[in-house]
């Protein structure tokens, strides 16, 4: 889907056209008797439309993705996790919506870019579909409005697709700016699309789960090894995009997010936390504490427990962890020097 990261890129980069000015944004009515708890759970993003002319430049690259909504860290927030294919790599982006005094209306504000998004749930039956409208206000770019269609399943009946089209048209979105997403299937963060072999250049391959280890296999280089960039500070670059990427923070020994402008920058720039960790993490990560993090994605991963001297499974919340986080037991053992599976049997008293 267009999750927070991609939606932010779309809206922040969208200028108001002088030749065809965007009209004042309409008042939006939310779903009557909106029930917040019923909107939680997993959704598939099936369609998008926008008054932003920039959409036409990327619509052929967009594909169906997923969004998971959960209770936030506080009662005033909703936690969002979107998973999508981007440039041949599956990436996961977490974010937070702020609740307002209007049920069904949420805010996302980025002070650095002086941009506020207002999202409204305008139509939903909770068990089948939901239509969101999002307003963007910027003193630099003017107002835009974006419509998104979600389904509990990857397919919806035709009448709901038509309802979405009518909603989008009713708020001024042009017919040629309504896009129904290609279904490329769900993805696991860090995985590569089969056809994206060109992405293997100048980066360490993210190995399949069954063969996953420390990533110490051959690295294809193209002027500069990715590892050589791990100690650099992140660089947003001079362009004005809002692409959420990961960089390795040597001080915290963790991969953290930053917004990449879309051009130049440096090699400490990764599409996923998994790719970042497998390229930059060192054995020093094995001495770090096991950190679940404040988010609530609850992904089952592996970490090295120094007190027990072995790799253990734990539930990772999805954000603000550290480098002591591995995507398979084998990878953990290879990094942290744990003996093979037969070791305990041989040494047991």
Curated annotation (Swiss-Prot):
**Which Cys-Cys disulfides exist here?**
90-187, 230-280, 239-263, 255-276, 286-336, 295-319, 311-332
What is the reported tissue distribution? Expressed by the liver and secreted in plasma.
Does the record carry Nucleus as a key word?
yes
Q: Which GO terms describe its molecular function?
A: heme binding; IgA binding; oxidoreductase activity; protein homodimerization activity; serine-type endopeptidase inhibitor activity
Signal peptide start-end: 1-19
PTM comment: The precursor is proteolytically processed into separately functioning proteins.
Glycosylation sites per record: 35, 114, 214
Q: Which SMART domains match?
A: KU (SM00131)
Question: What broad class of enzyme is this?
Answer: oxidoreductase
Q: EC?
A: 1.6.2.-
Q: What cellular component GO annotations does this protein have?
A: cytosol; endoplasmic reticulum; extracellular region; mitochondrial inner membrane; nuclear membrane; plasma membrane
Binding sites annotated in the UniProt record for 3-hydroxy-L-kynurenine:
52, 110, 136, 148
Identify the residues that the record assigns to the BPTI/Kunitz inhibitor domain, covering every copy: 230-280, 286-336
Keywords from the UniProt entry: Cell membrane, Chromophore, Cleavage on pair of basic residues, Cytoplasm, Disulfide bond, Endoplasmic reticulum, Extracellular matrix, Glycoprotein, Membrane, Mitochondrion, Mitochondrion inner membrane, Nucleus, Oxidoreductase, Protease inhibitor, Proteoglycan, Repeat, Secreted, Serine protease inhibitor, Signal
Any single Pfam family the record assigns to this protein: Lipocalin
Homology family: In the N-terminal section; belongs to the calycin superfamily. Lipocalin family.
- Name by which UniProt lists this protein: Protein AMBP
